């Protein structure tokens, strides 16, 4: 289980941080839960969060790119379940590369909470469902908000040193 090795993360105060959540609607039972739980976690931490929905995983990067122009951070959520063709690999690679490029191009946190799983049961177990081992929507939100604070800390320290 990928939960092994997950670091303990301190509770953060995300007051004043704006975050967009971009979620696919494909595999709705999974994506709806990821979306709702990520937004609820942002609200719990004090962030200003807005949610947006796109059809599938391939539409996520372009919506994330637009959101990154307006928000401090973006959380991308979706669920790609392996089928019998190579399409799974193309979709997963495309989404991951797109999100990484956007983060580097904008210098903004883009949290990748797009599940890439072999079975629907694996997706449920990572979606924050009752009894699930993991909650990737909450984890992605936590990572995005924490990274905003860390980037601000880096800028502040560099500025104090005249860098």
From Swiss-Prot:
Residues that hold (2S)-2-hydroxy-3-oxobutyl phosphate according to the record: 84-85, 126
Enzyme Commission code: 2.5.1.78
GO biological process: riboflavin biosynthetic process
Name of the featured protein: 6,7-dimethyl-8-ribityllumazine synthase
Keyword Nucleotide-binding among record annotations: no
Alphabetized UniProt keyword annotations: Riboflavin biosynthesis, Transferase
Source organism: Corynebacterium ammoniagenes (Brevibacterium ammoniagenes)
Role this protein plays: Catalyzes the formation of 6,7-dimethyl-8-ribityllumazine by condensation of 5-amino-6-(D-ribitylamino)uracil with 3,4-dihydroxy-2-butanone 4-phosphate. This is the penultimate step in the biosynthesis of riboflavin.
InterPro entries: LS (IPR034964), LS/RS (IPR002180), LS/RS_sf (IPR036467)
